[in-house]
Amino acid sequence: MLKKSKVKEIQEKVYEALKKANIAITPEEKENIEVADFGLGDLENTGLQLLVYVNTDRYCAKELVLFPGQTCPEHRHPPVNGKPGKQETFRCRYGKVYLYVEGEKTENPHCRPPKGSEQYYTVWHEIELNPGEQYTIEPNTLHWFQAGEEGAIVSEFSSHSDDESDIFTDPRIKRIPEIED
């Protein structure tokens, strides 16, 4: 569980990272930065910071901010209410992000899963994204990603985002963060 004071501290850190990458946000957006530790209490290794610009029934746009070596755990976006699941395009804006998807296993991948969670990382086809590069993930595709040494900022453009419906390989994960005073 995250403390409100820790969330404020991380929001400030994300704001500074976005500024460094020349991505301007409003004070209101700064307050709306979501800090997700996935219920594991190890934000430094397993976590993600998100800023949603828009999320309608038809499309979604957000920034994903990862600190150096931080990992968003393996998950997929399944079909929901007759819709095929979220299709998303990741475009790297700053740093480097290693994306792992279904497909032929990459020999000698750059990343390792967080210690103690290795069994919950099953897809190993590596895609390296540098600033200006992008990759589209099809609906219901297992994927996970990890920031490089300087961290990463990734713009996500997708169909409707319904994070509550995401299915994570690790049964311990809680997608929606719990915040305490």
From Swiss-Prot:
Protein name stated in the entry: D-lyxose/D-mannose isomerase
Its biological purpose: Sugar isomerase that catalyzes the reversible isomerization of D-lyxose to D-xylulose, and D-mannose to D-fructose. Shows optimum activity using D-lyxose as substrate, but can also effectively catalyze the isomerization between D-fructose and D-mannose.
Record's subunit section: Homodimer.
pH dependence (UniProt free text): Optimum pH is 6.5. Retains more than 50% of maximal activity from pH 5.0 to 8.0.
InterPro entries tied to this protein: D-lyxose_isomer (IPR010864), RmlC-like_jellyroll (IPR014710), RmlC_Cupin_sf (IPR011051)
SUPFAM superfamilies, sorted: RmlC-like cupins (SSF51182)
A Pfam family this chain is assigned to: Lyx_isomer
Positions with a binding annotation for Mn(2+): 75, 77, 88, 143
Family (UniProt): Belongs to the D-lyxose ketol-isomerase family.
KW Hydrolase (keyword) present: no
Coiled coil segments of this chain: none
Main EC class the enzyme belongs to: isomerase
Organism name: Thermosediminibacter oceani (strain ATCC BAA-1034 / DSM 16646 / JW/IW-1228P)
